[in-house]
């Protein structure tokens, strides 16, 4: 009788990701003008080199919302080099391999997404669209600040995950849990 030795069971992430590796994360929203831009800047800062964030949209607006750039500047987060772009750039040959795709708006979460090379882990972190707020300049600024605070809470939870030591089912559950995290932004 021939005995074969099989490898111990590991998740695709444990096989694919090892210690010291930078994880590529793609944040998606419809217009790629506010929420996904804020998330990209936050993760590239708070991820401290462990993560490289990108952002894109299903129907990019063509420009980043000026209040998003203003808020990034006022909070000392990176604000240069952002552009509103299509998610197709990240599904094309030669695109950076993406490990996580996170939608930050309900519209993008409900759309049929491209097939992402490498089958990244996905999650939805719904955040109200600050660009849709009508009212005074102060009310609009508050909406952007609230979105940034909610994203910051979730990004901090994400960066604290021991990704390399979690199996894929546990990691997926943790990502969903982060997406359901309520934040107290009433004082925004």
Which residue ranges define each predicted feature?
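Short polar/charged helix/loop
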Residues: 2-188
């Amino acid at each position: 009788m021939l005995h074969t030795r099989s490898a111990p069971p590991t998740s695709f992430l444990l096989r694919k990701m090892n210690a010291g590796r930078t994880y590529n994360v793609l944040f998606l929203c419809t217009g790629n003008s506010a929420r996904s831009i804020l998330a990209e800047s936050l993760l590239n800062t708070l991820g401290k080199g462990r993560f490289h964030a990108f952002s894109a949209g299903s129907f990019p607006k063509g420009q980043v919302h000026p209040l998003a750039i203003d808020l990034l500047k006022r909070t000392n987060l990176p604000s240069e080099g952002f552009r509103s772009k299509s998610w197709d750039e990240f599904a094309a040959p030669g695109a950076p391999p993406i490990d996580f795709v996170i939608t930050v708006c309900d519209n993008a979460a409900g759309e049929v997404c491209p097939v992402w090379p490498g089958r990244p882990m996905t999650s939805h972190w719904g955040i109200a669209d600050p660009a849709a707020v009508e009212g005074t300049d102060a009310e609009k600024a508050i909406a952007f600040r609230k979105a940034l605070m909610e994203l910051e809470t979730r990004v901090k939870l994400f960066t604290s995950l021991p990704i390399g030591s979690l199996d894929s089912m546990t990691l997926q559950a943790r990502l969903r849990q982060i997406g359901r995290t309520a934040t107290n932004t009433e004082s925004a």
